UniProtKB/Swiss-Prot annotation:
Keywords associated with the record: Ribonucleoprotein, Ribosomal protein
InterPro entries xref list: Ribo_uL30_ferredoxin-like_sf, Ribosomal_uL30_bac-type, Ribosomal_uL30_ferredoxin-like
The gene coding this protein: rpmD
Family to which the UniProt record says this protein belongs: Belongs to the universal ribosomal protein uL30 family.
Annotated GO biological process: translation
Complex formation: Part of the 50S ribosomal subunit.
Molecular function terms, GO-annotated: structural constituent of ribosome
Designated name of the protein: Large ribosomal subunit protein uL30
Coiled-coil boundaries: none
GO CC entries: cytosolic large ribosomal subunit
Superkingdom per UniProt: Bacteria
Disulfide bonds listed in the record: none
UniProt keyword Ribonucleoprotein present: yes
Native organism: Desulfosudis oleivorans (strain DSM 6200 / JCM 39069 / Hxd3) (Desulfococcus oleovorans)
Length: 65
């Protein structure tokens, strides 16, 4: 489970529970269509699972991004 993942916020945080908003902010996602590259760790996988209905997730082609 090594490498990196591209995570994009696909839907707005408006009207979402505070826990979901905190998870998104911790991932560095603050605006719709923002993309961040994160390490593929169990912690990040858990965060993605919590808010998967708001995200678009892609595996990064290489770890340099």
């Amino acid at each position: 489970m090594s490498g990196s993942i591209k995570v994009t916020l696909a839907k707005s945080m408006i009207g979402r529970p505070e826990k979901h908003r905190k998870v998104l902010r911790a991932m560095g996602l603050t605006k719709v269509n923002r993309t961040v590259c994160l390490q593929d760790t169990p912690t990040v996988q858990g965060m993605i699972r919590k808010v998967s209905h708001l995200l678009r997730v892609e595996e990064s082609a290489d770890g340099s991004e």
